[in-house]
């Protein structure tokens, strides 16, 4: 049994190394842009299109996009860690609105960029026109719950009783971010997604047993001003 486990782990490691090599080769073919260039595209009011595919297909898909996009690069890497904490009301109102595909629905989250040690409070609204409108402010990296200033900002986005929002889910993942040469759209690839859900009536505790991952899938998102 131990031998079988060792062989299984060895195969997983070799497979991971092959994937990382293929991914690095695909990304090396891209022209690169920096964060200043990426931020020059104003897509805070946009149309989103999402796609799901197998992680093993990512290197090939990247190779097919190289003629149309450049890749964000910082500190000599094009693959970045993201950490999101999603907030909701105790009755899961925000989640249920999303699940039931209601329009004029919201998401509230903290987004942390470990590479640059920065953190933002973000409110995303899906309008009745099918557009995504995002508003965000920079917050201290140590913030974990909705404070007074955060609550004011959230209320300004049309969400009532923001002080009753509590963290419900944590999500960690890797992202590759692209922009087209016309500087009119972004394309992101999220993978190695890990989720951890909150339990009990606590602002800080997350259930280590209630976690799951989408290790074999990639979520691609195309962000455009219009279709």
State what each model feature region is.
Residues 2-227:
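Phosphate-end processing signature that detects enzymes handling 5′-triphosphorylated RNA
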